[in-house]
Amino acid sequence: MAAASSSRVLLAAVAVLAAALAGCGAGAALDDPAGLLRRAKEAEFAGWMVGLRRRIHENPELGYEEFATSELVRRELDALGIPYRHPFAVTGVVATVGTGGPPFVALRADMDALPMQESVEWEHKSKVPGKMHGCGHDAHVAMLLGSARILQEHRDELKGTVVLVFQPAEEGGGGAKKMIDDGAVENIEAIFGVHVADVVPIGVVASRPGPVMAGSGFFEAVISGKGGHAALPHHTIDPILAASNVIVSLQQLVSREADPLDSQVVTVGKFQGGGAFNVIPDSVTIGGTFRAFLKESFNQLKQRIEEVIVSQASVQRCNAVVDFLDKDRPFFPPTINSAGLHDFFVKVASEMVGPKNVRDKQPLMGAEDFAFYADAIPATYYYFLGMYNETRGPQAPHHSPYFTINEDALPYGAALQASLAARYLLEHQPPTTGKAKAHDEL
């Protein structure tokens, strides 16, 4: 009798413990975005992501050099029991969670840092001179690993396969294009990308249907004349004067040739020529970037930039050679959000952070190589995750040596990415047929 009573007490204790575990965030249902956010905000979970972010931040790596970052990602995936393939595009990693069959939806994080010196003095400052995570990619990797952990905890509930894409070389290297070329995203139906935003409040997400970021390209031109003594300009052919006229003329491409309602940018950010006060150099090198949302406008800008540089140099008796640098820096197409995915995003995000915290985002003239995925995947969606908190004081902008991450944003990114992927699979089940379909695996 006593033994039976003890057994009942033990069973009751186990039941209480199980109920307690079910009540915590880890027991949140996969189709409950708010519950997944609570899970990601738990002290141990959030602290784990913060630790990952700081380790990556201390050891920044430039595009196609993310070997240590890639190793960290693979080590964490191993610890979570998540299978992956490696390498893609030198350092890229592609992991999968779920059934291994369709539908397939992807989540992407970029891994590379910037060639700049960090000026923020804190415990986890960059240990690599001249390199810094100044755009938040360290946070992106930590959040995607957080999403991986959430999804792995619910792997038996997934109605398909989530593909986790850890991509190198977003900052000008076109890593997304090389991931595609290496077969990293075959058979995927939709992909979501996120970027931390310094001007969007914490707990708020923002995006829009259609164009969200511009297409971009770079150009460089060498303008050659005839050098000589500055006191005898009539014996020279001055490339500095020619380059100055070129730069002024380039500004007219937007102000006088572009439709004011069709946003375009041409900026010259590089001017190198001469090294002495009293010497006219033989040549000058200028360089810059051009941006547009429409493919036709982008191509028109490219054509006119070359025409203006060559023609204006000729007027000044100089020669010019223009290089668009697209072999090493491929042109980025505009980032276009699929209209159907926007409605889906608003619905899922509203369930997590509330409708008032899902906001429209004006298009940006910045560029994102996430745009390349639209060439290989039917539906793509890119959004911004808020991290601004006025109590922290002024937030330095992206690509500033004083840029910092509000680590309170990490749980929001991890939970929302996981929720978007899981809900997408649930709502895009393939039709049931008696025959196996083609392309039913990655």
Swiss-Prot record:
One of its GO terms (cellular component) is endoplasmic reticulum lumen. It is found in: Endoplasmic reticulum lumen. Its EC number is 3.5.1.-. GO terms for biological process: auxin metabolic process. Its main location: endoplasmic reticulum. Pfam families: M20_dimer (PF07687), Peptidase_M20 (PF01546). Residues 1-27 form the signal peptide. A motif (Prevents secretion from ER) lies at residues 439-442. Belongs to the peptidase M20 family. Hydrolyzes certain amino acid conjugates of the plant growth regulator indole-3-acetic acid (IAA). PANTHER family: IAA-AMINO ACID HYDROLASE ILR1-LIKE 1, PEPTIDASE M20 FAMILY MEMBER. This is IAA-amino acid hydrolase ILR1-like 1. It comes from Oryza sativa subsp. japonica (Rice).
